[in-house]
Amino acid sequence: MTRRCMPARPGFPSSPAPGSSPPRCHLRPGSTAPAAAGKRTESPGDRKQSIIDFFKPAAKQDKHMLDSPQKSNIKYRGNGLSITGTEQFERKLSSPKKLKPKRMSSEESPILEAFMKGGKEHHKDRGVHESRRPCMSLSKYLPKGAGIYAPSSYRLPKEIKAQKKKHQSPERRKSLFIHESNREKNDRDRGKNSEDSRKQATATEGDIFKHSSRSISSRSSLSRHHPGESTLGARFQLSLASYWREREQKKLRKEQMEQRINSENSFSEASNLSLKSSGVGKNCKPRHEHSKHTEAVPGKSNLSTLENGHLSRKRSSSDSWELSGSKQNKFSDKRTEELCGLRPEKHKRTYHTKSKRVLSREAPRHIPSERKVYQTHCTEDSWWCSALGRHSQGAGKTVSRGMSIASTLRLYLGRVISQLWKMDISQEKDHLQTRGNFQALNRINSPTKEQRNSVDSDLKSTKEPIIPKARESFLEKRPDTSHQREKFIRHIALKTPGGVLRLEDIAKEPEDETDRSSADSAPSNAGHHSSRNSDQVHSASTKETKIQKPHLPLPQEKSTIKRASNLQKNKPAGSVTSKETKLPLLSHVPSAVSSRVPLNAKNCTLPVPKKDKERSSSKERSGHSTESSKHKEHRAKTIKAVSNESSGKNSGGSLHSEYAPPTASPPAALEVVPSVPSPAAPSDKESSGNSNAGSNALKRKFRGDFDSDEESLGYTLESDEEEETLKSLEEIMALNFSRTPTTSGKPPAVSKGLRSQSSDMKEYAQSGTYTNTLERLVKEMEDTQRLDELQKKLQEDIRQGRGIKSPLRTGDQDSTDDGDGLLEEHREFLKKFSVTVDAIPDHHPGEEIFNFLNSGKIFNQYTLDLRDSGFIGESAVEKLILKSGKTDQIFLTTQGFLTTAYHYVQCPVPVLKWLFRMMSVHTDCIVSVQILSTLMEITIRNDTFSDSPVWPWIPSLSDIAAVFFNMGVGFGSLFPLETLQPDFNEENLISETQKTLGGKESEDSPYSPVFSALPETNILNVVKFLGLCTSIHPEGYQDGELMLLILMLFKMSLEKELKQIPLVDFQSLLINLMKNIRDWNTKVHELCLGINELSSHPHNLLWLVQLVPNWTSRGRQLRQCLSLVMMSKLLDEKHEDIPNANNLQISVLHRYLVQMKPSDLLKKMVLKKRAEQPNETIDDSLHLELEKQAYYLTYILLHLVGEVSCSHSLSSGQRKHFVLLCGALEKHVKCDIREDARLFYRTKVKDLVARIHGKWQEIIQNCRPTQGQLHDFWVPDS
């Protein structure tokens, strides 16, 4: 790839700046050089030399300042990206020893993007530098007076060790701006070179600073040779001189600080590590608010004012990097000082970068790049707090990825203890000796309190038992501040008493607790960067509104306060107060902490304004946007309630408890009780018993609120300045009173509002109780009795077949009784809109044929005896049966003795008659069926004897009549027609039967009904046997007897109880009887007239027609003739001789069809009604009833029409008759029906008309037309 020199733009200098080298570019042969080089043309040798110079590697420029326009070797951790961003405008020179690095996208490095954009703007505004390369200065993007430079000695310790191992040169440095892709690679290199890193970690502090000073001096001297550069070098020299002065002061004050610490060791007492829940997800205060407050607080003065007098290094504890978009990218004062300040490598400081990552020596690999951790450089103990905090952050995220809490705790505690063990504890003490250095470092590193809080909260989230031992602390006053604030310096060190490793913690000043609680509620404007992940964010800002105290006593007057299981303590005036956070105590975490407070109660009281406390609670609740709103409000209200209750129970000094937001994992409980009771509080033992109940209840409540597996591990830091109105303690306790039962003997003190509310609830519950009175019981008894009577009445109506009465039925006699309670207009309304659905029933009404009271009148199963039949037994079986009793005779019959006895011998007639009668009267249906089987087998066996001159026995007409008469059928029902009567009458039938059975026994035996219900099994058994007899012996009955049997069967089929029973056996017997009639053509008309007289109801007549089988020729003929006879009867026509020819029958059917008009039938009925009752007028109800009857009759007539037309095969000659029938059906019947939604019977009739018309159309289509005629034309009626 070659590069060309582009022509200079108008207004752009065409010659390079003085002292700069000409630009490296290729020139075409014959082209002119720039104006500065003259107008000569280059020779081929010059061109070759220029090409060589172009590809010649450039000299190392790693000693230039960041502000230098030349290309610097300070890279983004080996990525090859220059800080000045000049790589965007020229091609990089590749090194043979180093692979070409990757470019960092602007999304991953917002600083680089801002630098590149700034480079373009600088290029447009100020032209080019002397090397014709666009340059830019970092001072443009920094605050006024701020300089930026990052010496190599302040890189992370592990990075320095890895570079020493790899390059063996202390002057090869990398930029502090770290890229995401190379961080993991360096972590792997650190793991491989862990042994060498430990050896190289013992490098002396003087050597490291010697390399730093050499690098700084080289950069400063180099920057003087470049005119036009910024004053960054001069500023840096001032910073360097200030630092060396600080180092000299530290060395001079080592011994003094060590002696003072040793003097305070005598007053220290053993305590445990404080695992207080602190500000996980602390919010940073807005920059403009803190800047105003910093000016008002003298304690937050600038470092340069105290040490150097340099105003460019102003620092504030709440300053942090704020990224407000890609267009605005400025360094804060804190960031500037961190980049320009000098820190020794020995103390393992944590570096802050503009990128979204923070790397430390102990930072785990799984910290995401989106996290922004605001930490500071403080004393050695605070550094370890931050290290532990970052470890716990990594552990917290590991837990969220599925790793158990216990394994995560063991992981990071092992790493921390291994590093702590190798530390030189004496050097840790020496670093914090001088008071001036402590003050300076305290101002620079004020966020250490938040780091300690994060360590405590993260240790709580592990739920592992940690048994620390406290270390002594000392009180140090700050005379240079106007507030005279004293601070407890908290140390975390390692002691080995008895060979056991213990983490030791020094109690903190209550003032620090107030600062931390205030810092927890301060929102951060930069929190939107960390809201996209679930990691805990450590804020570097603290709230400046600290509690002012007049003075504090000496360290010798301090007393230790233990943590115990009580959450609330009633302390009188002057009692020792504590501001430790109280959270639910987990049974498996026996942790405790010691807190140093003065014994002087007057000086120890720390009043906290109620307004600040409410603001803190409000902001705490608004800071956690990842939780649901209901859970968030409930938790905040619970915390507020506990705080108010604990403060309200203190009589003299208020016990102010400050609560930080809950940790990601369920925190361990740390509670405070005084280990040494105060002399001024003799009633602590008594008050502790009263407070145990409330404490235990609150523990359970907190445990239910916080011990959840669904707790989120991250919190958002979006600021929410709105304050919500909190409910009072009485309201909250009233809501939760039912869910917090007391465990102690004394109930907890309930407020007045709570007592009043509970009393109201009790009164409401008592008012809603249900009480029985005498009047109510009497009323219930009456209602129950009335319902029982109604139920009995309904059952009786159903038993009698009347059904359930309804006022919707019109025309019924019972409906008027039910509607007596209704008004007349209501009754008329019901009649008008009532729907009539039962005008045309689906089944025929039937008749009562069997009278069960007369059943068994002639004989029964107990009077029938084979010995009284005159039978004389010859075989052994017959003798055995004759010797047996009545019951044994039936038993031997059913067991097959008679079948075996008469297998080869003719059965005597008395035995067959006895079996036939016993089968008809026996009440046991199983026995009746067995007897039928025996009787049929014997009959069939007797028919096989062809050599016998006697026909097998078949029951005579009198035997059949006697059996049915004994079942309860009257003699008139058996023979209903007067013209067709048998040779015997009822008296003869009874006398003959009694003679055969023995008259004495029958007379002496008492009479009692045999059947209480229809003996359908017995009836069907008799019909089956008759069917067998008519089949075996067709000539057994004469034509007259056959006709009487047919009429008998038709009459018995009208029985109401037989409507739901399929009468297949009846039809089989009818087929045999019709087939056995010898003179069929003569007898068919007489049979039709006799069947037509069996009933007067049209629907019963239709049932008789449908009972005739139509699968035989005689059956179809009987159906046709019977239908025509019935139609003539129903239409009041004269009985004429039924023509035998089919064509004539269809012609007669057309004449009847014209008379089936519903309106004409209604007129006839009305006239008939008036003739019968001339004095009565026909009202609407009667007219409606007559209309129902007319449509009912039309329905029956149409069915009979269908039976006539569809009961035989038709020829092509009958086609024209069916065409005429279709026309008459549509004209006279279909067109006369007016359907109504309330009159369903009309629709039912019209439906039947459509079905019949469809059948006729099918017949017409199947018939062949007349010769020479293709279509049927309409012919008008004559």
UniProtKB/Swiss-Prot annotation:
Q: Where is this region: Required for interaction with SLF1 and RAD18?
A: 807-1278
**Positions of the UniProt region annotated as Interaction with SIMC1:** 740-1278
**Chain residue ranges for the region called Disordered:** 1-235, 248-337, 443-491, 509-582, 598-724, 739-764, 798-820
Q: Where in the cell is it found?
A: Nucleus; Nucleus, PML body
Q: Which residue ranges are recorded for the region named NSE6-like domain?
A: 769-1271
What's the stated role of this polypeptide? Plays a role in the DNA damage response (DDR) pathway by regulating postreplication repair of UV-damaged DNA and genomic stability maintenance. The SLF1-SLF2 complex acts to link RAD18 with the SMC5-SMC6 complex at replication-coupled interstrand cross-links (ICL) and DNA double-strand breaks (DSBs) sites on chromatin during DNA repair in response to stalled replication forks. Promotes the recruitment of the SMC5-SMC6 complex to DNA lesions. May play a role in SMC5-SMC6 complex recruitment for viral restriction.
Please give the name of this protein: SMC5-SMC6 complex localization factor protein 2
What species is this protein from?
Mus musculus (Mouse)
